[in-house]
Structures are given as structure tokens and as C-alpha cells.
């Protein structure tokens, strides 16, 4: 029997999941790694911890399954996007900690580019906004701040990559410096329609092209693992950014189909077919994938904080463990007038305000831990609701249902709240780690074992959550939410 091995490298941990060709989970392994916050608004990872945790997870998944590497048809990668790394081409030594997608240190760089009137150019070429979220200004910051880095980059001595590229480099022993279009499309340097690095944007930012990885199709040939890593070489046949992998794993293959992945942040993607749809309101135009020789596009809306809101409750002592949030929040019927705006690192779509910060409003002497727990869940659900309706309107589609996956999708109360605040059913698949499943399916396609047309029949619904809240109540809650968001905006003052 042959298997597919998915490496799912996330913001807080690295996963490896072994699947059958039909998408059934055989074994799972996960290892967490440290987040570093050197200053407010700065978020970093140790590149070696990313690699070592991912390698451990891959070995452990095979061990738990009792499967040797020769039984693995192919390996695929899904990864946190935008996170930016640079390393020496000769030695593979990282030259700075990885700057994580959540990091806001380049807000002033983005503002300077906007003041130069460049937002329209970047939007037209990449589908993205000038925001610290994306890789380009992180890379520019490194080139300006790390001594000697620009000179070495111009001589071709330095590699830049997102996390997929860093993993590929290490899996292949430095033989492959590559990425796929979904990851490239999140850098602010990639032309959405030509599917190439954009020479004009590189000139505008002063980024040497010699730094950049080769772009290969999402189901392309990315080499094979070094024999000593997993016991024998394994072909690498699929690479996708994590949110695009989840869209594929939800079998959202047609225009108008979409999903929301609830991880550290919440990420909504709506498939728009073979042509990009350009939208306002903070929505992004992006690649869904490049599979079977064709590109598919999507609209994306990002909520920077989702599961991280529950993590914050735990860190400040309101919860013992994250999973306790559901039972605690069930102790109350509502949030008691409390609004929790989870803008710890700014606001994503539809607001895109890097200067916003988190806020809890409406506190009284009667507010309890349970009210705060429920308000945190509602804050994430409100944020997702704003994005979902904006996305459906921009694409000219009615919102009929939302497919949910990721860690928070295991929380029944949260999905009940999400359905109530959206006013449409929320569907949970049997395999909720659809990011890894999408990576597995991409590599199955790359290995010739699957086709896109096979995927809808392999997707299974596990649960359906129906809205029960009266429309008048929903509208009243949203009015309060909008007031709370306005209080959180523009909180950080430059200088």
C-alpha cells in the first residue's frame, strides 16, 4: 500500500500527517516550537527550530504508522506564508531570525511606499496591499538592517525564502532553492497574471533578484529528500501555502466555493476560477494554486488573531488550558455586553489598520471569566463574519454556507456562535486538518495518483451548525461590534 506524507509547518508547531491515497489519516505527529517577541509588535522564530521540529514530526509520523519511507509515494509541504528567512547559500546558515507574518516592524516602510503613490502599482501587479503582513518589506528591512547583507545578496551569496523554501532547502541538502506560485504570490514581488517575479517591483524596492527562489508549479517536481533524513529518498511533489492547501483540502474547486481556516489567525479564501477578481474593502486577490498546468485564483480575507485570542486568555491566567474555553464560555448565554476586539497585531480585512490594538470594552462589576471567554470567541466570529460578507459581495455571490477547518473548528460552541453571527450554516469536514490534506492531495496530483476531479468525492461532512439567532439580535450585536472596532483603530501613534 502506498501513502502520502504531508508536512504542515504552522506558526506555533510543525505537523506531519500520513494519509492514504483516499485521504484517510494513518498517523499524526506534532511538535511545538517557541515564539519570540523581542519588542512589542515584533514576532520571530528560530529557523533551526522550524526545521528541526518539522523533521522530527516527519520521522515520528512514519514511526507511529510503522511505515517505511519506501511506502511513501510522495511528500508535500503546506506552510505558514509570508514569514521571511535569509540564509547563506554556501552553508545554509540563517543570517537572522525568521520574521513572522504577524510581525509589524515594517509599518513605517509601508507607509513611506504609500506616500510615494505606489500602492496602486503593487495592487495591480500582486493583488495585495502595502502592509507589513507580506514578505517584501520584511526582506527590505533585513537588507537595510543586517550588516553586509545587501552586498552579499547582490553577489549571489544569500538565499531568501518563505518557510516552504527553507524546508525544501534542508530536505534536499541545498540542492533545491524553489517555491510555488501560492507562496510567491504572498511576497508583494510576484505578478499574479504572468506568474513570474516582477522586475519593476524589484527595482522599486531595490531587492536583488539573485536572492529569489525559482518558482515551480504547485504540483511540480521539487526534488527528493536526502537519503539519510527519513531512511530513503522520498520524492517531493507538492507545495502550497497553508491557506491555499486548506482550500484544496476542502475540495473547494469551483468558482464561488470557499472556506475559513481557524488557526493562530483566521483565513477565508473564495475560489474565483481561472481569472483573478479585483476587489476593494481590504480583500486580497491571490493564487489558489497552479495544478495540472492551470492557475486558479481566489479572494482572501485575513483575520490576524483567532486561536491566538484563546491562547492569550490562557497566558493571562483566565484559562488553564486552551480547550477549557468552550466549557467556560457555555456557562453564560451571551457575553454580557462585553466586546473583545482581537487586534493584538493590528487589523486585517476589511480594515487593514496596522496601528490598531486589542481592546476589551463593556466591562462591568458583573463581568465574569465566562463572559470574557465568550466575548473572545465572539470577537473572532465577528471578525470572520465581516470578511465573509465582504468577500461574497465583491465576487457577486450569495453566502450560502461556510466550510470550517483548523484547530478552533473542533470547538462546537464556537461554530454555533459563528453560524449565528453569519446567519448561514457552518460545515465541519470529517478531516479538520484540511491544510495537511490539501498538501497530500497536491502531491498525489503531482505523483499522478490523483486528479482534481477526484477530490469532491473524497470530501466528507462531519457536522453542520445552523444559525438560530434572530436577525434583529444579530444586527444589534454587529452595531456594537462596529463601535468597538472603531475604538481599537489607530491606537499606536508613530513617534
From Swiss-Prot:
Key enzyme in the regulation of glycerol uptake and metabolism. Catalyzes the phosphorylation of glycerol to yield sn-glycerol 3-phosphate. PROSITE patterns: FGGY_KINASES_2 (PS00445). The gene is glpK. The lineage of its organism: Bacteria, Thermotogati, Deinococcota, Deinococci, Thermales. GO terms for cellular component: cytosol. Sn-glycerol 3-phosphate binds at residues 11, 81-82, 133, 242. ATP binds at residues 11-13, 264, 307, 407. ADP binds at residues 11, 264, 307, 407, 411. Belongs to the FGGY kinase family. Glycerol binds at residues 81-82, 133, 242-243. InterPro entries: ATPase_NBD (IPR043129), Carb_kinase_FGGY (IPR000577), Carb_kinase_FGGY_CS (IPR018483), FGGY_C (IPR018485), FGGY_N (IPR018484), Glycerol_kin (IPR005999). One of its GO terms (biological process) is glycerol metabolic process. GO terms for molecular function: ATP binding; glycerol kinase activity. Pathway: Polyol metabolism; glycerol degradation via glycerol kinase pathway; sn-glycerol 3-phosphate from glycerol: step 1/1. The keyword Repeat does not apply. Keywords: ATP-binding, Glycerol metabolism, Kinase, Nucleotide-binding, Transferase. This is Glycerol kinase. HAMAP family: Glycerol_kin. Its EC number is 2.7.1.30. It catalyses: glycerol + ATP = sn-glycerol 3-phosphate + ADP + H(+). The keyword Lyase does not apply. Inhibited by fructose 1,6-bisphosphate (FBP). It comes from Thermus brockianus.
Amino acid at each position: 500500500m502506498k501513502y502520502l506524507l504531508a508536512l504542515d509547518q504552522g506558526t506555533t508547531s510543525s505537523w506531519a500527517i500520513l494519509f492514504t491515497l483516499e485521504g484517510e489519516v494513518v498517523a499524526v505527529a506534532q511538535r511545538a516550537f517557541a515564539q519570540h517577541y523581542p519588542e512589542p509588535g515584533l514576532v520571530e522564530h528560530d529557523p533551526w527550530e522550524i526545521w528541526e521540529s518539522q523533521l522530527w514530526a516527519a520521522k515520528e509520523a512514519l514511526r507511529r504508522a510503522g511505515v517505511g519511507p519506501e511506502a511513501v509515494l510522495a511528500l508535500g509541504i503546506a506552510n505558514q506564508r509570508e514569514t521571511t528567512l535569509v540564509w547563506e547559500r554556501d552553508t545554509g546558515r540563517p543570517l537572522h531570525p525568521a520574521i513572522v507574518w504577524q510581525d509589524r516592524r515594517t509599518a513605517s516602510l509601508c507607509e513611506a511606499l504609500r506616500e510615494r503613490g505606489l500602492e496602486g502599482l503593487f495592487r495591480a501587479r500582486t493583488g495585495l496591499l502595502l502592509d507589513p503582513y507580506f514578505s517584501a518589506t520584511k526582506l527590505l528591512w533585513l537588507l537595510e538592517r543586517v550588516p553586509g547583507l545587501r552586498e552579499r545578496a547582490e553577489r549571489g551569496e544569500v538565499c531568501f525564502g518563505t518557510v516552504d523554501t527553507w524546508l525544501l532547502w534542508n530536505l534536499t541538502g541545498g540542492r533545491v532553492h524553489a517555491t510555488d506560485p501560492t507562496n510567491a504570490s504572498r511576497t508583494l514581488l510576484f505578478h499574479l497574471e504572468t506568474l513570474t517575479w516582477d522586475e519593476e517591483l524589484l527595482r522599486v524596492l531595490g531587492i536583488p533578484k539573485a536572492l529569489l527562489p525559482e518558482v515551480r508549479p504547485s504540483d511540480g517536481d521539487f526534488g527528493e529528500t536526502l537519503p539519510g533524513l527519513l531512511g530513503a529518498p522520498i520524492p517531493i511533489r507538492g507545495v502550497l501555502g497553508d491557506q491555499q492547501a486548506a482550500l484544496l483540502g476542502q475540495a473547494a474547486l469551483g468558482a464561488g466555493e470557499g472556506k475559513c481556516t481557524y488557526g493562530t489567525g483566521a483565513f477565508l479564501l473564495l475560489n474565483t476560477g481561472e481569472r483573478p477578481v479585483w476587489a476593494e474593502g481590504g480583500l486580497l486577490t491571490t493564487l489558489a494554486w497552479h495544478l495540472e498546468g492551470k492557475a486558479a485564483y481566489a479572494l482572501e480575507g485575513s483575520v490576524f488573531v483567532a486561536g491566538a485570542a484563546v491562547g492569550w486568555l490562557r497566558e493571562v491566567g483566565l484559562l488553564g488550558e486552551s480547550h477549557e474555553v468552550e466549557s467556560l464560555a457555555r456557562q453564560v448565554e451571551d457575553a454580557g455586553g462585553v466586546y473583545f476586539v482581537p487586534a493584538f497585531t493590528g487589523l486585517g480585512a476589511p480594515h487593514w489598520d496596522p496601528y490598531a490594538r486589542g481592546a476589551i470594552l463593556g466591562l462591568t462589576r458583573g463581568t465574569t471569566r465566562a463572559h470574557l471567554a465568550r466575548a473572545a470567541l465572539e470577537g473572532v466570529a465577528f471578525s470572520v463574519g465581516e470578511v465573509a460578507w465582504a468577500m461574497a459581495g465583491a465576487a457577486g455571490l450569495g453566502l450560502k454556507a461556510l466550510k470550517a477547518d483548523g484547530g478552533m473548528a473542533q470547538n462546537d460552541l464556537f461554530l454555533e456562535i459563528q453560524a449565528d453571527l453569519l446567519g448561514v450554516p457552518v460545515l465541519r469536514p470529517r478531516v479538520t486538518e484540511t491544510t495537511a490534506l490539501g498538501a497530500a492531495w497536491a502531491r498525489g496530483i503531482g505523483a499522478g495518483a490523483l486528479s482534481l476531479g477526484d477530490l469532491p468525492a473524497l470530501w466528507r461532512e462531519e457536522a453542520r451548525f445552523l444559525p438560530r439567532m434572530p436577525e434583529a439580535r444579530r444586527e444589534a450585536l454587529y452595531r456594537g461590534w462596529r463601535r468597538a472596532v472603531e475604538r481599537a483603530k489607530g491606537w499606536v501613534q508613530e513617534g
